[in-house]
Amino acid sequence: MCKIFTSRAFLVSVLGALALLAIGFMAANSTLSVSSIISAFFPHSLLSKPKTLRAQDLALPPLEIGDLVFRRGDSLESVIISQVSHHHYTHLGLVISADPLLIIHATTDDNPSTQNQVIISPLDEFLFHARSIAIKRLPLTNAQQESIALSARAEQGRAFVIAEGSAALYCTTFVESVLAPHIALNLVYDEVNLPTWSGKYLFPRVFFDMPKGRLIYERRL
């Protein structure tokens, strides 16, 4: 292999550029994920999976339906989203069952058999891609929690779409659409201006920083 590719800085810069191109490609209604596009160009040895959290290592408090679950992932896609949004967390899910603990989220490739759609993940599956996790509790009544769980489950299998406006369905817009009928959120979309990716998008940071709700747990590697 050419010596230049042994430089981590060079590799990160190349992967970063490719990731931005991939995100732009996905925004143009591609069915491919950023990770799959990058993997097609680089050997697995260069993209080896870093250490992630395990359920048995977490001292989670009892969770409730409607809890927001934030994740920083283990992929370059997560690094790019973190840089663009200026925030640690890059993915968002919603608890729809406390026992067993189930998290619903819109994702590209968490589960190889159900790519680019809204899926329901047990905690272990959600953590498989997590280097950090945080949980925020919203002020919800029991009736609101039950309604949220029902409406969220009805969305399972909907296609993941990076876009602007009503056509969008990615992790944060999915959670927004489920919660909005039950609780005032007042979320502000961020303007993105990059060569291959531009427009107004909703990042996990907005949910994390909003005054409504309280942080009940956080763990970072």
Q: What are the roles of these predicted feature ranges?
A:
Residues 61, 116-119, 143:
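Lumenal/extracellular "mature" regions of secretory-pathway glycan-modifying transferases
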Residues 71-134, 160-169:
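Glycine-rich catalytic cores of cysteine/serine-nucleophile enzymes that process amide/ester linkages
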Residues 20-96:
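N-terminal accessory segments that precede or flank the first globular/catalytic domain
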Residues 77-78, 130-192:
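Active-site nucleophile-His-acid catalytic modules used for acyl/amide transfer and hydrolysis
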Residues 7-14, 20-35, 162-221:
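Activation targets extended, charge/polar-rich intrinsically disordered C-terminal tails
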Residues 66-69, 124-126, 148-153:
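Short amphipathic alpha-helical segments, especially helix-boundary/capping motifs
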Residues 116-117, 146-153, 205-216:
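Short secondary-structure transition/capping segments
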Residues 1-6:
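N-terminal Lys/Arg-rich, disordered targeting/topogenic segments
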